[in-house]
From Swiss-Prot:
Residues 90-111, 165-360, 400-530 are annotated as: Disordered. Disruption phenotype: Mice die perinatally and exhibit severe malformations of the axial skeleton. Pedicles of the neural arches and proximal ribs are not formed. In addition, dorsal root ganglia are disorganized. In the hypothalamo-neurohypophysial system, neurons are viable and able to express neuropeptides; however, the connectivity of magnocellular neurons with posterior pituitary elements is compromised. Gene3D superfamilies: Homeodomain-like. It comes from the Eukaryota. The gene is Uncx. Keywords: Developmental protein, Differentiation, DNA-binding, Homeobox, Neurogenesis, Nucleus, Transcription, Transcription regulation. Residues 248-257, 275-284, 407-419, 482-504 have a biased composition (Pro residues). Belongs to the paired homeobox family. Unc-4 subfamily. This is Homeobox protein unc-4 homolog. Expressed in the paraxial mesoderm, in the developing kidney and central nervous system. In the somite, it is restricted to the caudal half of the newly formed somite and sclerotome. In the central nervous system, it is detected in the developing spinal cord, hindbrain, mesencephalon and telencephalon. Expressed in adult and embryonic magnocellular neurons of the hypothalamo-neurohypophysial system. Marker of antero-posterior subdivisions of the somite.
Length: 530
């Protein structure tokens, strides 16, 4: 280890000893001594002291040439002449006491940083305030008075002038400090605390004003945006949601007089209708405000084409009469958007019946027209095949159970005998099963096939021929062209029917459950003749 440290420093003061250890083939001259640096000389002296004598703090910390010469076992005569050590000067002080280049040209070393004391800096600042460019005589006087070297004083003045120029060139406006400004003066003295407090106060006030302005702007934007959104979205919500279908507020029940007011109301013609099973969704023809966007509470009652005027005034939805006078809340307002309840799309049949105050589910539709072919977009998916969207004819009055077209002549009443109805309802088709085109009135009669009764059938068909309209025209319905029955008598089934009024769309049931066409949804409600 020690030999390795000795090999790292093959310097001149160890010429004799290193020559014996390493065996250099040439002697070391004086020019090798001039290449030494100060820190290398210190480390070499410490290594030599550690190799010759036991470790000691003095041997490790001594940095002078005299200590190195005393610790070397075989000193060479080159050492005192090389470093020029007379014992009175020590060139390795932290604060420069002289210029080593002038006093000892043989010992070239790296100059350490000069540490100025506080009173030295004060004297230098006073001299700088008097003159930025002192002459050589003034610098010499400062160096003698401050125990410094004239070259250090000259370098300090150069740095001080550069700092002063930089500060002068980078001055900004009155409110913005320079990028290199600190709360100290150029001489390192602390700034006036009042000045620092004033600058900090200005900075805080400026930041506070900026924050208040930003907060006020955000509040004004927040106040303006919901109002404008609700104003602009009110008509669009009317057109998009039929009768407030998107609003989370539950619909209010209609007044009790609305149920029995008009011919198209719920309670007028429901007595003979069969209730819809609770498991099936309601047909689009029922009184659901979602399927009829043209009947809106906000737009008023708009008369429809091809319908009597009295049908348009009838409230269709449960909350139509209640919401007609009240301003509808926008579905995009802050209250409706933040409410936890989901938007009510469509009421279930049980809920609709309970809301309307009915003891059973309404089966007859209130508005028979559907959205197909009217140019509207379907807001909700169709839950039934298109073949079973069967609108029913609304009853004209609640007094008479029988439906008669307005333009047809009065027909003689049908015989009320149950055998005649049974034989008419069970007239066999071509395959021997019950004919769906002539299925009538009550399901128990249809379900029990019996032998045909030609006499009663002839009476009924003769009465229908006299009236000039088919049997289906008596009840206000149009049956599809069915297969001709066995040749008993010419029936007006395949022939042209008397058209129903436009206000009463016709319907006829599909195949019966017992027929060969397979299972199908329940057919449209029929009105009993009795």
């Amino acid at each position: 280890m020690m030999d390795g440290r000795l090999l790292e420093h093959p310097h001149a003061q160890f010429g004799g000893s290193l020559g014996g250890v390493v065996g250099f083939p040439y002697p070391l001259g004086h020019h090798h001594v001039y290449e030494l640096a100060g820190h290398q000389l210190q480390s070499a002296a410490a290594a030599a002291a550690a190799a010759s004598v036991p470790f000691s703090i003095d041997g490790l910390l001594s940095g002078s040439c005299a200590a190195a010469a005393a610790s070397v076992v075989n000193p060479t005569p080159l050492l005192p002449a090389a470093c020029g050590v007379a014992g009175e000067s020590q060139p390795f002080k932290l604060a420069d006491s002289g210029d080593p280049d002038k006093e000892s040209p043989g010992c070239k070393r790296r100059r350490t940083r000069t540490n100025f004391t506080g009173w030295q800096l004060e004297e230098l600042e006073k001299a700088f305030n008097e003159s930025h460019y002192p002459d050589v005589f003034m610098r010499e006087a400062l160096a003698l008075r401050l125990d410094l070297v004239e070259s250090r004083v000259q370098v300090w003045f150069q740095n001080r002038r550069a700092k002063w120029r930089k500060k002068e060139n980078t001055k900004k406006g009155p409110g913005r400090p320079a990028h290199n400004s600190h709360p100290t003066t150029c001489s390192g003295e602390p700034m006036d605390p009042e000045e620092i407090a004033r600058k900090e106060l200005e900075k805080m006030e400026k930041k506070k004003r900026k924050h208040e302005k930003k907060l006020l702007k955000s509040q004004s934007r927040h106040l303006h945006s919901p109002g404008g959104l609700s104003l602009h979205s009110a008509p669009s919500s009317d057109s998009d949601s039929g009768g407030g279908g998107l609003s989370p507020e539950p619909p209010e029940p209609p007044p009790p007089t609305a149920a029995a007011k008009g011919p198209g109301a719920h309670g007028s013609g429901i007595a003979g209708s069969a209730p819809v099973p609770p498991g099936e969704p309601p047909a689009p023809g029922t009184c659901d405000p979602a399927f009829y966007p043209s009947q809106r509470s906000g737009a008023g009652s708009q008369p429809r084409l091809g319908r009597p005027a009295d049908k348009d005034t009838v409230p269709c939805g449960p909350g139509a009469a209640a919401t007609a006078g009240l301003p509808k809340a926008s579905p995009f307002s802050v209250e409706s958007l933040l409410s936890d309840s989901p938007p009510r799309r469509k009421a279930t049949p049980a809920n609709a019946a309970a809301t309307a105050g009915l003891d059973f589910t309404p089966g007859l539709p209130c508005a028979p027209r559907t959205l197909i072919g009217k140019g509207h977009f379907l807001l909700y998916p169709i839950t039934q095949p298109l073949g079973f969207l069967v609108p029913q004819a609304a009853l004209k009055g609640g007094a008479g159970p029988e439906l008669v077209p307005k333009d047809a002549p009065p027909a003689p009443p049908a015989p009320p005998a149950p055998p005649a109805q049974a034989s008419f309802g069970t007239f066999p088709g071509p395959g021997g099963a019950a004919d769906p085109a002539f299925a009538r009135r009550s399901p128990e009669v249809v379900a029990s096939p019996g032998p045909p009764a030609p006499a009663s059938f002839r009476d009924l068909t003769a009465a229908a021929a006299e009236s000039g309209a088919g049997d289906c025209a008596d009840v206000g319905t149009v049956c599809p062209a069915a297969s001709p029955p066995p040749p008993l008598e010419t029936s007006p089934g395949p022939g042209p029917r008397a058209p129903s009024p436009p206000g009463e769309p016709a319907t006829c049931g599909a195949a019966e459950p017992g027929a060969a066409t397979g299972p199908s949804p329940p057919e449209g409600e029929e009105v009993d003749m009795d």
